[in-house]
Swiss-Prot record:
It is found in: Cell membrane. It comes from Mus musculus (Mouse). InterPro entries: CALHM (IPR029569). The gene is Calhm4. This is Calcium homeostasis modulator protein 4. Pfam families: Ca_hom_mod. The chain crosses the membrane at residues 15-37, 49-71, 105-130, 185-208. One of its GO terms (cellular component) is plasma membrane. Oligomerizes to form decameric and undecameric channels. Two hemichannels can assemble in a tail-to-tail manner to form a gap junction. Residues 38-48, 131-184 are extracellular. Residues 1-14, 72-104, 209-315 are cytoplasmic.
């Protein structure tokens, strides 16, 4: 891929409107496939409401949780700016850092709400789930044919409306009117949700920027700084960890995997195996340097090979 295409794709992936649009499109496609292959109203009294409501709300909750869980920034906020009483003193953040964390959390929430709001909007505008959930609660007192029907029989007939493929001629107009009413109500709720979500998004953006300690240019710089810091840190951490692990492995075994000229190997002692079997935590407390590794810090002396038994590798 050419550098120009790489630059364009990178800028698109970092563009919030493009990512939000992509999430919304994928959610719409997933909702249509989900409805086509999995949803079938039970058309039974007492089950329609729970079944339709579950298909309407539960996927939205799952998408919301996934939206939070899949954002790396969410775990950064949780680990770096945690204000719990159990947080060690050296990890407690300042008021300014907490305000920046709140600003970051607003951004994360805005992105996480795209998929569930899209799901709810599309399902309400389609009306299938709502029609199933509300079928047994329809008001049909104005129709003469229901005047002499017992309440239990009426509930059974109403619950079966979403599944009627063939019905008596006097029931078909009533069923169509009830279905039309439910779709109208569902679509009205969908448009109300769109309006409320738009207003809430605008207000949250304004509130976040108003309460932010950063100006517009500072916020832009800070966002780019966090992104570049994360990218460079991951590259440096990967290279550093590989070099450190190779150094530790050489101290334990006397050679590094991939070496062409191996003349000496070291046999780890029982104490070495006991120590490298216990995981060590990174920089806990006020220690100046953490062990970083399962391999520990025991085998660090320059003359370790002279004191431990080894095997010379003949060429």
């Amino acid at each position: 891929m050419s550098p120009d295409l790489n630059c364009i794709s990178s800028s698109l992936l970092r563009s919030e409107p493009c990512i939000n649009s992509l999430i919304a499109i994928l959610t719409v496609c997933g909702q249509q496939l989900f409805s086509s292959y999995t949803f079938s109203c039970p058309c039974q009294v007492g089950k329609n409401f729970y079944y339709g409501s579950a298909f309407l709300v539960v996927p939205a909750l799952i998408l919301l949780i996934a939206g939070y869980a899949l954002r790396g920034q969410m775990w950064t906020v949780a680990s770096e700016y945690c204000c719990c009483s159990c947080t060690p003193p050296y990890r407690r953040s300042s008021p300014l850092e907490r305000r920046l964390a709140c600003l970051m959390f607003f951004d994360i929430t805005g992105r996480a709400l795209v998929a569930p709001l899209t799901w709810l909007t599309v399902t309400l505008l389609t009306g299938t789930y709502y029609e199933c959930a509300a079928s047994e609660f329809a008001s049909v007192d104005q129709y003469p044919m229901f005047a002499n029907v017992t309440p239990s029989k009426r509930e059974e007939m109403l619950a079966g409306f979403p599944c009627y493929t063939s019905a008596p001629s006097d029931v078909i107009p009533i069923r169509d009117e009830v279905a039309l009413l439910h779709r109208y109500q569902s679509q009205m709720l969908g448009w109300i949700l769109v309006v409320l979500a738009t207003i809430a998004l605008l207000l949250s953006k304004c509130l976040a920027r108003c309460c932010s300690p950063l100006t517009s240019l500072q916020h832009h710089y800070w966002t780019n700084h966090l992104h570049n810091e994360r990218v460079l840190f991951e590259k440096a951490a990967e290279e550093h960890s590989q070099l450190l692990i190779r150094h530790r492995i050489k101290k334990v075994f006397g050679f590094v995997p991939g070496s062409e000229d191996i003349k000496h190997i070291r046999i780890p002692s029982c104490q070495d195996w006991r120590e490298i079997s216990v995981p060590n935590l990174l920089c806990v407390g006020d220690t100046s340097q953490g062990p970083y590794s399962f391999l520990g810090d025991r085998v660090v002396e320059e003359n370790e090979e002279d004191r431990q038994e080894g095997i010379e590798m003949k060429p």
